Amino acid sequence: MARSDEDSWDLASSVGATATMVAAARAVASRGPEALIDDPYADALVRAVGVEYFVKLLDGEITLEADNAAMLAVMTDVMAVRTRFFDDFFLSSGLPQAVILASGLDARAYRLPWPSGSVVYEIDQPEVIEFKTRTLADLGASPAAELRTVAIDLRDDWPRALRDRGFDPTAPTAWIAEGLLIYLPPDAQDRLFDNITALSAPGSRLATEFHPDAGARIGASSQRMAEEWRRHGLDLDMADLFYDGERNPVVDYLRERGWEVEARSRPDMFAHYGRPFPTGEAVEALRQSLAVTATRR
């Protein structure tokens, strides 16, 4: 089903199901002695959502055709590298405030070693926030920093909701927008960065990722995966969730608004973390993706 300005979701449907998919990839990527990441909560969160396909995937009960199995392995590696990039961003920022936009099943507030006095804000749809908070509490997990959830759709007035939860716009902040931009219309992407800029004191930092020609390139490979998923009973076509249209390049957009920006390609990020970047047609859509970090002047 195509997106609309008023659509909503839980963690088993639409955009929310992609958060569960990413958590499943993090759970798989956390296994083994050479795992690049360690997310001890991802597996339990995915099982709590209860989407049968993702649970079977965790249990090794899904058999995919060769091309799709290879694509799944690539996506698991991509999520491992992406997760580690954002983990390292927070760990290196040293800032007292952190904001996770569209937090989904992100458990960084619980699993990262935050400095004493850190405050972490998570912003997402109310149902998503409630589910994750309740599930982690049931698991006996406690946040490793002061966690303040902001239950609001990013299409609404989230800056006001964030300030109402105690956010201090005069203090430097570390922001992440992970796996988010492709699900926003181009004009909403611009508004997101405008709002972040307005809320960011000098010294604030931002990490995100940008996929040039995202809709066309990633949509085609997503459709192939959707066909495979349907064979296993999962009705999720990610291509329907992406917004097409020409986007302002993130690097240029941020620089024009007072940020010092660095960008690294996905193959460079793989090399940085000691992982070979895969080859083949299936991964060409991923090659152009950029890991972006910025500091507010």
UniProtKB/Swiss-Prot annotation:
Signal peptide: none annotated. GO terms for biological process: methylation. It comes from Mycobacterium sp. (strain JLS). It holds the Pfam family LCM. S-adenosyl-L-methionine binds at D124, D153, L154. This is Putative S-adenosyl-L-methionine-dependent methyltransferase Mjls_1072. Keywords: Methyltransferase, S-adenosyl-L-methionine, Transferase. GO terms for molecular function: methyltransferase activity. Its EC number is 2.1.1.-. Coiled coil: none annotated. Exhibits S-adenosyl-L-methionine-dependent methyltransferase activity. Belongs to the UPF0677 family. The keyword rRNA-binding does not apply. It is an enzyme of class 2 (transferase). InterPro entries: Ppm1/Ppm2/Tcmp (IPR007213), SAM-dependent_MTases_sf (IPR029063), SAM_mthyl_Trfase_ML2640-like (IPR011610).
